[in-house]
Amino acid sequence: MKVLFRAVASLAVISAVFMFSKVIEAKPFYKGKRVVMLINYAPGGGADRSGRVIARHLPRLLEGNPRVICKNMPGAGGLMAINYISEIAKPNGLTVSNFSGGYTYQMLKDPALRVDLTKNPWIAGVGGTSIIYARKDTKPGLDKPIDIWKVTNPRDFKIAGFRITGTKDMRERLTFQMLGVKHYPVTGFRGTTKSRMALLQNEVQAFGDSRAAWFKTIVPNMINTKIAIPIYHYDKFNADGSVSAYPDLPGIPTVSALYKQKYGKMPAGMEWEAIRWIQSLQGSMVRNTTLPPGSPKAAISAMRKAYSKLAKDKKYKADAMKSLGFTPEFVDGATVAKLLNWALNDNQKVQNWLLAEIEKWKKKKW
């Protein structure tokens, strides 16, 4: 009888331990933790503004309801933070990105990028475009987008940029080169805020911003005050191969529409193919979210679920509309990974041409 009692008691203890372990396993990964959202540009830019809106809602949607704080790490055209999250940040699931661009550095084999972005566990991407605007007093005077062809001296139309292999710099150079507009690229600015200040002080005459900055910063401070006018926004490249305008930017021509207005036909050639290559990624992951390589599967899964909820969340959408002036369009992490593989592996002709073009830009006496 004692033997039977001991056996039953032992089974009860084992069962209790098993049940307790299950309870522990069921505890949400992020319960009681703090997450740092790393932003690769300075405060005030589109990446910063969009990241802070997400950070306000992520704790509510992420299982375990952790604290989420934002940390800006600008530098090297966004590269400092990109290298940091893959090289230095602990793979414990507690550092998540809200990066702007970055993938072009790998597409073009920039040695400053020391990591392989395809090894990152991608969480989500946010698609979008950029709007290029210019000072109205650019010689001989700009009243409408087509007036940019009136510029006769490249140094009268200086365009601010960050890094020659960065998305912003490449797209602007390619576009104005394709359009046949005289221009003078000025690279090396440390972030959007300093670039805008340079434009306000007439050190440069043109710059490009995302919609996150356009609606809430540029329109009230530069467009409505008659300092600048919008020149174009980048086309949306659709899955069927067509291009279209972004519906929330009425009255601002796309690159293809502006080209057609001037030349009477759609753009073609290697510049256009390179713009398509870059903007196809930008249209799905102008902002991109990842964790450090080697992060726990539980963290990756929980974060992906949270971003999936975020994309449909009414409170987030309302906040985004109020804070950014538009509602971001999300794509899932699997789509981001596929796009990266496509860009890196299936476009060798465009990639090689653009690498050669960048070498020409470096040698050109502007």
Spell out what each predicted region is.
Residues 107-121, 181-184, 217-236, 241-266, ...:
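Ligand-binding "clamshell"
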Residues 66-83:
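Early extracytoplasmic/lumenal segment of secretory-pathway proteins
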Residues 92-99, 204-211, 229-231:
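Paired acidic/hydrophobic, glycine-rich loop segments that form the ligand-binding mouth/hinge
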Residues 1-32, 360-366:
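Short, low-complexity disordered leader/linker segments with a strong preference
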Residues 33-42, 68-71, 95-96, 156-161:
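Short, well-ordered beta-strand elements
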Residues 29, 60-65, 84-95, 106-206, ...:
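Hinge/capping helix and adjacent helix->loop/strand transition within the periplasmic-binding protein
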Residues 31-32, 224-230, 240, 250, ...:
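An extracytoplasmic/periplasmic, membrane-proximal ligand-sensing/linker region
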Residues 37-52, 74-77, 160-167:
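Extracytoplasmic "Venus flytrap"
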